[in-house]
Amino acid sequence: TALNTLSLHDALPIYKTNFWKKPTTKVKPLIMAWNLPDGRRWDKPTEQVAADYGFQSVMCPYNRLYLDWMQVTPGEADVNEVYRGGWGDGSVNSVATVYNYDPLANLGSRSQYALGVQGNMWTETTNNNAELEYQLLPRLQALSEIAWLPAAKKDWTSFLLRLQNHSSIFDALKLTYAKHYFFPA
């Protein structure tokens, strides 16, 4: 089997998940496991590996859906914004990057193994609610759309135009948000 070709380090999590799954299938629980960072597993196409072994997964690639990364490069940041944050290493996950991610693209005919998408926000990069809001908004709108809209129906121009309506909502709620994708009033 494919399991026999893996190193012990890579095979052990699969073995443990299968071990715990077998005795509990009578009550139909959903077994969830996280790829621990002990071997930097987040830099591999884990959705493909999970599908190869018959596991369902929630798609959360770091290079697309980690919302603690900067929204734009430091050179593109508006100096008038209260917070421009995110990881300071130059890593960027823009609204466009999030929106253009197709969670099923790497699965081909195995799309049944995709349970959904998840955006991660590691809050050690934020000091208060305003910074957290800035990191999330408006990328949450892009994440929401990729979660429910088939890739064939996505339209960046349409999304960008619809996104403009959120500016007045964010302002009315006194939320801090990245204004890079909003047209001047």
Label each residue range with its predicted role.
Residues 15-185:
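Flexible, acidic glycine-rich loops studded with aromatic residues
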Residues 1-10:
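Single conserved hydrophobic/aromatic residue that forms the stacking wall/gate
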